[in-house]
A protein has these predicted regions:
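Short, Lys/Arg-enriched N-terminal segments with co-localized hydrophobic residues
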Residues: 1-6
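Conserved N-terminal boundary motif of the eukaryotic protein kinase catalytic domain
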Residues: 21-30
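An alpha-helical support segment within catalytic cores of ATP-dependent transferases
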Residues: 7-21, 124-176
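ATP-binding pocket architecture of kinase catalytic cores
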Residues: 29-151
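Short, conserved clusters of charged catalytic residues that mark active-site
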Residues: 10, 23, 64-67
Length: 176
């Protein structure tokens, strides 16, 4: 059996576990535009699913994205896709999401802007960070808790990016 076929079988199994019934993929359409991941829209004829695929080593990136979506969803401020699952096959990892309808910019745009503003007004803690690390594209991003926004941003956003640049041979000098 080909690696791709094994991957699609693994995806069907995760979706079957999520939906409580066998998920027979009847249609697969590649979605253009992903720079880091391969993206697909699949359906069993009833439930469309958005699929992000990458090498097996990217599973932790997909797990972090799923955790972030679930965390943001708890704010009840903005419409986000439901996470159906994260999984792996022999050579691939994948993130399975509710397929949201894509629409042209309409009069719903101001509503989305209002929801986004509400999201940024949510405050659940006086500290900055997360209980888990995340990813910025293909790059790991630490999120250790810090009581100071300025220190968090300087060390774990700007400082971290400068360190990544230095590791790749780009040195901006001493910033301490």
């Amino acid at each position: 059996m080909s690696r791709r076929r094994i991957m699609w079988k693994s995806i069907s199994q995760v979706l079957a576990d999520q939906f409580g019934a066998y998920y027979n993929i009847k249609e697969k359409n590649k979605v253009p535009g992903g720079e880091v991941n391969e993206t697909w829209l699949i359906t069993d004829g009833i439930q469309p699913v958005f699929v992000k695929v990458n090498e097996r080593s990217y599973r932790s990136m997909f797990r972090a994205e799923a955790d972030q979506l679930n965390l943001l969803g708890k704010t009840n401020t903005i419409r986000l896709p439901q996470v159906y699952g994260v999984g792996c096959s022999q050579n691939h990892s994948f993130l399975l999401l509710e397929a949201l309808p894509i629409t042209q910019q309409t009069n719903a745009t101001p509503h989305f802007a209002e929801e986004l503003a509400k999201l940024h007004q949510v405050s659940g803690t006086k500290n900055y960070g997360l209980d888990f690390d995340t990813w910025l594209g293909p790059e790991y991003q630490p999120n250790k808790w810090n009581g100071s926004w300025a220190k968090f941003f300087a060390e774990q956003r700007i400082g971290w990016q400068l360190q990544l640049c230095k590791d790749k041979g780009l040195d901006f000098g001493d910033i301490d």
